[in-house]
Amino acid sequence: IGVLNRTNVLVLASVQSPLPAGYSVRTGALFPVEETSSGHVILAFSPEEVQNRYLARRPESERANASARLERIRLNGFEDTPSTMIHGVQNLCVPVFDTRGVAAAITSGFIKQINAPATAQETLAAIRITALELSRTLGFRLETSPFEAALSQ
């Protein structure tokens, strides 16, 4: 789970794969927002002024694509994309909300393992359920949110 920390994403907690082999990110790690699905998911559900500050820091030639990515994430309610840092890893990322809005993002670095039963779609569904449960614990109310689609299945 990651949160914004200025222009970075701070990894607050990391869980090891339940399988014998896997990929994980170190708790406490900092990554530039633009290099992470967590950063983009948090930004996609952040207030417009936060998004505009982020877009203003991007090179002008990248702004339209960055803006379109944020819009896609808002429409889908999640991001499912190849990792920009690790080949072969598929980032599955979902927002976590509190009473004020987006608070964090949960990301699974999905790697399809031979003979492993879970698919990316099943993993994403599980992450969405977990994000909704965590959001409710933080005071989020699905019924009153403009981002209902982000966490509803």
Question: Can you say where each PLM-predicted feature lies in the sequence?
Answer:
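Short hydrophobic alpha-helical segments used for membrane anchoring or interfacial signaling
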Residues: 1-6, 15
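Bulky hydrophobic/aromatic content
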Residues: 5-11, 148
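Residue-level signal for well-ordered, solvent-exposed loop/turn and beta-edge residues enriched
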Residues: 8, 101-102
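Short hydrophobic/aromatic beta-strand element in the GNAT-like acyltransferase core
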Residues: 11, 81, 93
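Short, solvent-exposed recognition segments
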Residues: 15-87
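Juxtadomain coupling helices with adjacent low-complexity linkers
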Residues: 65-71, 76, 87, 103-153
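Sensor-regulatory modules in signal-transduction proteins
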Residues: 96-99
